[in-house]
Amino acid sequence: MTTKKQPDSTIALNRKAGFDYFIEDQYEAGLVLEGWEVKSLRAGKINLSDSHVIIKYGEAFLLGAQIQPLPTASTHFIPDPVRTRKLLMNKKELNHLIGSVERQGYTIVPLSLYWKKNKIKIKIALAKGKKEHDKRDTIKDREWQRDRSRIMKKNT
C-alpha cells in the first residue's frame, strides 16, 4: 500500500526576514481573510517581503502584506491588496509579544504563510534588526559555506 504524497502546504516565504533580522522566537497565528483573498492565496499571489506585525489595542495586525486580487474577482467590489489583516492568537502568546516589543525593543516579522487543515496560518517571529555589518557577515558566511561544499565535493 502506498501513501499519498502530501503537497507542499507552504504558500509564501519571507526570505528577507532571515537576512534583515536575528530571529528569536516563532509563533503560529491564524489570519482573518476575505473570500477573494483566500482564492488569491490558492493561486500564490502574495508578497510578504515588506510586511510586519503591529500590536494595537491588545490585538495583533499584519501590515504591508500584498495579496493581489485575481482578474476574475467581482466587479462590484473593489479589493484592497494592502489592507490591514487581524491575526488570531492566544492571549498568553499575545501578552508575551506585547511585553517583548514594548520593553525590549523587538520587532515582529512574518516568516511564512501556509495551509494547516484547510486553514491559512502565518508563522511570525520575534526578531531584532541587524546592522549593516551583521548583514555583511551573513553574506560572508553563506559564501564560505558554498565554497567549502565545492572544495569538499571536488576532493572526494
Curated annotation (Swiss-Prot):
Localization per record: Cytoplasm
Q: Which PROSITE patterns match?
A: SSRP (PS01317)
Q: What is its main location?
A: cytoplasm
**Which PANTHER family does the record match to this protein?**
SSRA-BINDING PROTEIN (PTHR30308:SF2), TMRNA-BINDING COMPONENT OF TRANS-TRANSLATION TAGGING COMPLEX (PTHR30308)
Its annotated function is as follows: Required for rescue of stalled ribosomes mediated by trans-translation. Binds to transfer-messenger RNA (tmRNA), required for stable association of tmRNA with ribosomes. tmRNA and SmpB together mimic tRNA shape, replacing the anticodon stem-loop with SmpB. tmRNA is encoded by the ssrA gene; the 2 termini fold to resemble tRNA(Ala) and it encodes a 'tag peptide', a short internal open reading frame. During trans-translation Ala-aminoacylated tmRNA acts like a tRNA, entering the A-site of stalled ribosomes, displacing the stalled mRNA.
Keyword entries, A-Z: Cytoplasm, RNA-binding
Where, if anywhere, are coiled coils annotated?
none
Please report the name of this protein according to its UniProt entry. Answer: SsrA-binding protein
Keyword hit for Isomerase: no
Q: Which family does it belong to?
A: Belongs to the SmpB family.
Q: Which CDD domains match?
A: SmpB (cd09294)
A GO molecular function assigned to this protein is: RNA binding
- Bias category Basic and acidic residues: which stretches? 135-150
Give the span(s) annotated as Disordered.
135-156
Look up the record and give one Gene Ontology term from the biological process aspect: trans-translation
SUPFAM superfamilies associated with the record: Small protein B (SmpB)
The organism that produces this protein has a lineage beginning with:
Bacteria, Pseudomonadati, Pseudomonadota, Gammaproteobacteria, Legionellales
Q: How is this protein annotated for GO cellular component?
A: cytosol
Q: Which organism is it from?
A: Legionella pneumophila (strain Lens)
User: HAMAP family given for it?
Assistant: SmpB
